[in-house]
Structures are given as C-alpha cells and as structure tokens.
Design a protein with these regions (language model features):
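N-proximal low-complexity "stem/linker" segments adjacent to membrane-targeting elements
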Residues: 1-32
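Acidic helix N-cap motif at the loop->helix transition within catalytic regions
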Residues: 22-25, 50-59, 101, 105
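A conserved acidic beta->alpha catalytic loop
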Residues: 30, 45-54, 73-74, 97
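Glycine-rich, basic loop-to-helix element that forms the pyrophosphate-binding segment
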Residues: 71-88, 109
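Conserved nucleotide-sugar donor-binding catalytic segment
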Residues: 86, 125, 142-231, 235
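Short aromatic/hydrophobic "clamp" motif used to bind/position activated sugar donors
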Residues: 93
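The conserved acidic donor/metal-binding loop of glycosyltransferases
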Residues: 97-101, 126
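Conserved donor NDP-sugar-binding/catalytic core segment of glycosyltransferases
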Residues: 105-139
Length: 285
C-alpha cells in the first residue's frame, strides 16, 4: 500500500544525489522514520550512472511523500539543491546529503524550536562522524563537540564552518532572500557561504543534540593545500571578510595541525569516558 502524501507539508527535505546506490536507501529511510511526519522529500539526481535512480524510483512508488527529479550532470551540489528548493512547497527547508543519516527526533526538535522562536532564521544540530575515519583525519573539523560550535556570525568567521549541512533546518523565506546556494563554478564552499550570507542579517541557533550521522569517506581528506587556500580566498573576496582559518591554511604547518588535533583528540577521549559517544541517539533506519 502506497503511503499518501501530506498535501501541505511544513518541511521540505532536499536530497541531491550522484552515484549514491550504496547509501541512498538508508538515507531516505532515516527521513521516512522521523517522529515528525509533516514533510515531503525532494530528491534531485545529478546524472547518476549507477543504480541510484532505480532504487529511488522503487521507494517513490511506495511513498507519495517522495518526489524524484533528474537533471543533467552539473558536478556541483549547489545546483540540484537549489533546483530541489524550487520544486518544494514547505515553509521550512532541510538539506540532507545522500550518504548521511538522521536520528528519529531531528525534525521534531528543530521545527519546534523555529516555531517558538520567530527571530531565528535557521537551526543546526551536532553531528556524529562515522565511516572512513582514522586518527590521521582532521579531528578538529569532525568532532561534534559543543565547545567549538559557532553561535553567531562572529563565531563563524573566527572558528570557520562548524555547521554540518545535513543538520540544518532553515526558513524558506530566509533562504530565498539571500538567493540560495551560490552556483558559481568557482564557489567550492557553498554551504559556508550560505551561513555567512544568512548571518549578515539573521540569527541562527545550535541545538546541542546529535541529530545527524555524518559519513566520512577517505577521499574527502585532501593534502592539496593550494586548493584549500584557493577556496578560502575566493570566499573571502566574495563576502569581503577575513577568515582567521585562511591564515592558518596559508601557514601550511603540519606541526600546528598535529598539535591542534591532539588537543581535540584529548577532549574527545574525555567526552567518550563520560559516555558522550555511547549515549547518542541512533540513526532512524
């Protein structure tokens, strides 16, 4: 029996995908199993060449809340995300990468907060990193520790992007007012750019609970310092800001990164010793 669609969903969940056959089904299930059910799922395939589309179409046939679109391959996630928003109807927009997972209460916690706090444009939650992670990974960027979370624009600029895209719920009006994601081919930090645009005039809030399982792949860790420097420089020029994290990248100091990561690893082990990792909610799959 096909699950019928909510005619007036409050939340639109946007999932871009490309060759995601390995994880896409679990990702979609983690949305379908939410305790909060007033949503639609907008999936936009960016020209997959594997079995991704067949998997999605099978799920779409069982649940009318799933709406599937296919576009020509762009190679830039900002394009299918913006396309998905245009096809959606919810008052709130959530983004979910095709290999990440949500916990069961993610949408409920966030929608309740935005309903009670009209002055807040978007909320984000903490994330738990899993997948191809090792001690060689940049732990500073991965660990979901609340002491390094940005809570305002100043924090974003000072600390860098601590907001996992899959953890965000944003008001449609706020998203559209800033023009959505930057689709410029030179823009490689489109999520960070979006938070910076929103925070120029709007407030955001951290919900200190783990609501996202953020999957890490070994290929995500690059030693290409020049490319990282280029991305940050572009963002600085685009938004006319100065990012301290850019200065750190320009130093290209492995020693400084190592010391920084060891400090954060120590904090992580302390959190683990008090049950931080074990007591988290599980994915809704």
């Amino acid at each position: 029996m096909k699950t019928e669609i909510n005619k007036n969903p409050q939340i639109s969940v946007i999932i871009p995908c490309y060759n995601s056959e390995k994880y896409i089904e679990d990702t979609i299930k983690s949305v379908l199993n939410q305790s909060y059910q007033s949503f639609e799922i907008i999936i936009v395939d960016d020209g997959s060449t594997d079995n991704t589309t067949a998997i999605i179409k099978k799920l779409e046939g069982k649940d009318s809340r799933i709406k599937f679109y296919e576009i020509m391959h762009s190679g830039r996630p900002s394009i299918p995300r913006n396309y998905g928003v245009k096809k959606s109807s919810g008052s709130f927009i959530a983004f979910l990468d095709s290999d990440d997972l949500w916990t069961r209460e993610k949408l409920k916690y966030q929608s309740d907060y935005l309903a009670d706090n009209k002055e807040i444009a978007f909320v984000y939650s903490m994330s738990y990193t899993f997948g191809d992670v090792s001690l060689l990974s940049d732990l500073y960027e991965l660990l979901p520790l609340p002491f390094r979370a940005a809570r305002d624009r100043e924090g974003l600029i000072r600390i860098g992007n601590t907001i996992t895209l899959s953890s965000v719920l944003v008001r449609r009006e706020s998203f559209e007012n800033v023009g959505g994601f930057d689709e410029d081919p030179e823009q490689k930090l489109e999520d960070f750019d979006l938070w910076l645009k929103l925070s120029e005039t709007e407030k955001f809030h951290l919900i200190p609970r783990i609501h996202v399982y953020y999957r890490i792949h070994g290929s995500q860790f690059s030693s290409d310092w020049e490319e990282r420097d280029k991305r940050l420089k572009y963002l600085e020029e685009k938004r006319n800001i100065r990012l301290p994290v850019h200065k750190n990248f320009r130093r290209k100091s492995f020693f400084l990164l190592l010391i920084r990561n060891l400090i954060h690893l120590l904090f992580y082990l302390c959190y683990k010793s008090i049950g931080y990792a074990e007591n988290r909610d599980k994915p809704a799959i």
